[in-house]
């Protein structure tokens, strides 16, 4: 399993539906997958990044995709399309980085220096 390496500081979810675990939500939107499996059972303590929220595998608008990812337990949201108007809207409507994510990214930055 990709999350088992405790030395990994970052990991990424996928927009895959694991029907035996969560019939309604892709992994990126699934609290059950993120909280119960990745965080608790596997014990991943790093920053969890969503896959690109502009991918066609997701059926909602960008803001909804971002919020659903964060509410499920992702710490950061990946948006790769680079559309300025959409990026501005995301910045205005999606919550700021939480303390856990700020601390972990700061630790990672120090590690890179």
List each language-model region with its residue ranges.
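Second-shell residues forming the walls of enzyme active-site clefts
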Residues: 1-101, 107, 111
């Amino acid at each position: 399993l990709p999350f088992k390496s405790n030395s990994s500081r970052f990991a990424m979810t996928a927009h895959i539906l694991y029907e035996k675990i969560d019939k309604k939500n892709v992994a990126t939107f699934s609290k059950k997958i993120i909280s119960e499996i990745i965080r608790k059972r596997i014990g991943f303590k790093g920053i969890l990044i969503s896959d690109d929220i502009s991918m066609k595998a997701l059926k909602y608008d960008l803001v909804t995709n971002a919020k659903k990812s964060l509410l499920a337990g992702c710490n950061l949201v990946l948006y790769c399309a680079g559309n300025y108007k959409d990026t501005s809207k995301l910045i205005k409507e999606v919550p700021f980085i939480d303390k856990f994510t700020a601390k972990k990214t700061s630790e990672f930055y120090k590690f890179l220096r």
